[in-house]
UniProtKB/Swiss-Prot annotation:
InterPro entries: DNA_mismatch_repair_MutS, DNA_mismatch_repair_MutS-lik_N, DNA_mismatch_repair_MutS/MSH, DNA_mismatch_repair_MutS_C, DNA_mismatch_repair_MutS_clamp, DNA_mismatch_repair_MutS_core, DNA_mismatch_repair_MutS_N, DNA_mismatch_repair_MutS_sf. The gene is mutS. The keyword DNA damage applies. Transmembrane segments: none annotated. This protein is involved in the repair of mismatches in DNA. It is possible that it carries out the mismatch recognition step. This protein has a weak ATPase activity. This is DNA mismatch repair protein MutS. Gene3D superfamilies: 1.10.1420.10, 6.10.140.430, DNA repair protein MutS, domain I, MutS, connector domain, P-loop containing nucleotide triphosphate hydrolases. PROSITE patterns: DNA_MISMATCH_REPAIR_2 (PS00486).
Amino acid sequence: MADYTPMMQQYLQIKEEQQDAILFFRLGDFYEMFFEDARIASRELEIVLTARDGGAGSKIPMCGVPYHSVDNYLARLINRGYKVAICEQVEDPREAKGIVKREVTRIVTPGTIIEEQLLDQAKNNFLAAVEEEPLCTGIAYIDISTGEFWLSEIAGENARSRVESEILRISPAECLLAGSGSLTGSWEEEWLRQQNITLTVWDELPLSLERAESLLLRQLQVASLESFGLKSYSAGIKAAARIIAFLEETQKTSLQHIKSLRCYSSDNFLEMDFYSRRNLELTATLREGKREGSLLSILDESRTAMGKRLLRRWIEQPLREAGEIEERLDAVDELKNTLSLRTELTPLLSRINDLERLGGKIGASVASPRDLLGLKSSLAVINDIKKALQPCRSEILQRLAAMDALEEVFALIDASINDEAPLGIKEGELIKTGYKQEIDELRELSQEGSNWLVEFENREKQRTGIKNLKVGFNKVFGYYIEITKSNLSLAPADYHRKQTLVNSERFISDELKQYEEKILGSRERLYSLEYQEFIKIREALIPYLPRVMETAHAIAILDVLQGLAEVAYQNNYIRPEIDNSGKIRIRAGRHPVVEKALREARFVPNDLQLDRDKARFAIITGPNMGGKSTFMRQAALLVLMAQMGSFIPAEEARIGLVDKIFTRVGASDDLAAGQSTFMVEMIEVANILNNASDNSLVILDEIGRGTSTYDGLSIAQAVSEYLLENSRSKVLFATHYHQLTRLAEKLPGIINLSVSVKETGNTVVFLKKVLPGKADKSYGLHVARLAGLPEKLIIRAEDILQGLEKNKDSRPAPTLLQPLLFSDSHPVVDELKQLHIDDLSPREALQLLYQWQKMLDDK
């Protein structure tokens, strides 16, 4: 190292501590990268790789990016999975004795982004941590840009799959795992990476419970965790503390806006596994992963960034407690039926900036003057919102009418920060005139200097006779006099040449140099004083941050409720009745997304009645394109919407509270994991069988079609009987196995439904209407004709079909239904009675299905 230049030695010393990150090393107006970092950055950022003299004749690979556009380059590296260490100059180069002092001021990872340009305003950017203990698993997650900090624990039956589902619901940008955790190194690690979640194995400090509690108490600035209801959450506390320790290591500063930690239980929310969330297209479409076409895109009429993020959370975490749901419905009801209130609130909400992330920037000490002005302009409308809410009667709206307007914060910013303040904080013009006398005096002196420069320029024009003479300034030479080459002969003898340009020469004079020292001295003092005063003002806002965050949350709730009311009004939604009856009764229900996509065409509404104690299992038959999948997804979405507190598209609805929604729809190979369509299907079915309860809603679409006909039919029937025997879940099961419709004659609780078709000659019209009874045929050839298959092929297929139908009676009929699979005398029943279902993995459940199928075939 001794052969390197002093600056390069400094770089290598700092890089030694940042081996796993690309080091952005500040040199003047650029961030430079060297050695392997430079090669990586050059390739990933598509910037030129050059070389620099490192000492002793060595050439070191180098590339760089301008500091003022660093966010763009930072985003590209983070999105590609790199960590970036930001190394800044921490002293004024003019005051440095030798090499300018530099330090890593922050390490940027996917879960620690605070730059506004790198964040999606409608989505949280969570950093999560998982801590496993023998009896439970703790999950914590934080969005440092908003200050939201959550903690939970999962234990009991099927805890592992519930942990995975919860992580995927949170959808963190980054997940911290302890190196000793059982998640690490298992297939889940690669699986989570496929969900674009960066996994960071980080166990630099072994966390005892005592150490974890100490970290949290220091961050939250409280004497006991009991005030947050956390005392018994040992695994959750360790997960939360791991996050805080990681942030202390990477952010190099105290995050003053993180003063609250909220715990929750997944038992309070309607549960959906990863497959169900994906299949129902709650926040993104299944095929393209786009927001447009999802339920979120239909329900989002929010006007604020906080509201958009909260709406996403409500969709992903519907409630299970009737009282909370009714509170939300009361508020939506009142807003929907009070047009004048919505008309008044909408423009007011539109004027509110992202208070959560503004508070986060203040807490992280990165807020600019314009951020403070954004906070002020948002607070300016709070009292108008409170006034509009005063007449409201619903409980939530009454609470929101009492939100904190933070008058002290508004007054401080209004009195101190210049309304036209620049984006930066070191160029002056930050502080209002009249706020601080010393700043006013320096500003006046600086202004006098500017006036003197104008006067000096005019005087020199007269003295020299050079009409286009001008006085300018740059950081290298300071103030100068510029004369075009055509007028050089008129330059006075007391001008001293400093710089030659293509078309002009630049000079200085003794008088200008003397006044420059006075002007620049006062201006530097002014800028320095304004900077110091701004920092004081920003720090003075920190004690108010908990109140800012509370007001931000209140605005978010109001915004979501207002948006749901607007959607209900515009789309003719009705208020569902919520109870614990175990029944789902929907009259003229409509699919919220499909009906909007139809535009001109009219969506065909359908009724649905399921009863946990009576007809709880509907087998749905009929042709493809008939509307079976839409009908089933519609049922799940309407239940979900009702339990999140939204009105729903129907004429009437009674929703008995559901604890879990499961969906198995569509076919998709998981090639990356080496799993076929059928394997994926069976894993999803096993998950449903292991986890469905008496209060669950199960959606099954074409179970068993990924294998041979008899294999598929036997599995489909076995699944149906298992659900009937082992739970009272409400089930919608669409199938092409018409043999299954006979189950309704033999098993109580099963009903048949079918999608109606109008047939005229060789043409069919799919009426999209779901009616009682079974379908008499599948209309597969009609669908093939509609799809545009050659007519010659269709005619040949019809001939083959007729031949098969003539011969079907000559073949022995399948014995699947005689006797029923789960009749008391069958050996499978004996195995089931001895089986501990909760201990089965999906793979073990699948193996059992194959084993039972073989027993059936042998018999």
